[in-house]
Amino acid sequence: MRNITLFFLLGICCITSFAQETNQRLKISHVCGDFYVYITYQSYNGQKMSANGMYVVTNEGVVLFDTPWDTTQFQPLLDSIYVRHHKKVIVCIATHSHEDRTAGLSYYKKFGIKTYTTKQTDEICKDRNEPQAQYTIDKDSVFTVGQYSFQTYYAGAGHTPDNIVIWFPKEKILYGGCLIKSIEATDLGNLTDANVEAWPITIKHIQQTCKNPRYIITGHQDWTSTKSLEHTLKLLEEYKKK
């Protein structure tokens, strides 16, 4: 009887675990060392689409790049990070003005997290009455938090007029956001604010400045390939031919 009961309970646990996995709204994946990608989801053109953000765990606290696309995951992300690493998020930098990057800025400011965008992003958010960061970055800057240093780099317009990338030169990690398309992407995605003419030049500037990246984190879909810069150029070339 005890064996039957145990088997039944194990079965229920497996079913519950499977249900949680299939309904998951927040996923955290390890990149390397202290670097992690977090993924949330929204519906785009009638399909479920992932949005990738990144965070790095430092001696002083956690630095977050972009905020969740799914607004229900602002707090679960903070909670998940604290449970995993026993550290709080202390800095958040959004890489452009779209909601899949900036939606949580106001929420995170309430918790004393220092939030940043470029001045250009801030002006766009202000004009559209959308969440703004507490601080603005006037030019390409180097941040040092704990044992890690990284650069904010504006290479030019592309997906949006204000998109920046984050470059960790020592670790060779490039966080590209929506400016860099995943190798899974079959088109350029949302072009509402895009500058398709400038975009290839911007990507080439990134290739020249952020050389030989070991990891390239794209804004959406699979981020595990280092060929995403080349793939973005290919998609742009295909778009020009249409």
Predicted regions and their residues:
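Bacterial Sec-dependent N-terminal signal peptides
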Residues: M1-T22
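Metallo-beta-lactamase
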Residues: T22-L26, H30-V31, G61-V62, W69-D70, K119-G158, T160-K227, ...
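Conserved beta-strand hairpin/beta-sheet module of binuclear metal-dependent hydrolase folds
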Residues: H30-L77, V165-C178
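Divalent metal-coordination and catalytic microenvironments
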Residues: D34, V56, D66, I81, ...
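Structural recognition of the beta-strand scaffold that forms the well-ordered cores
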Residues: V37-I39, Y55, V63-F65, I90-A94, ...
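Short, electropositive alpha-helical surface patch
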Residues: T226-K242
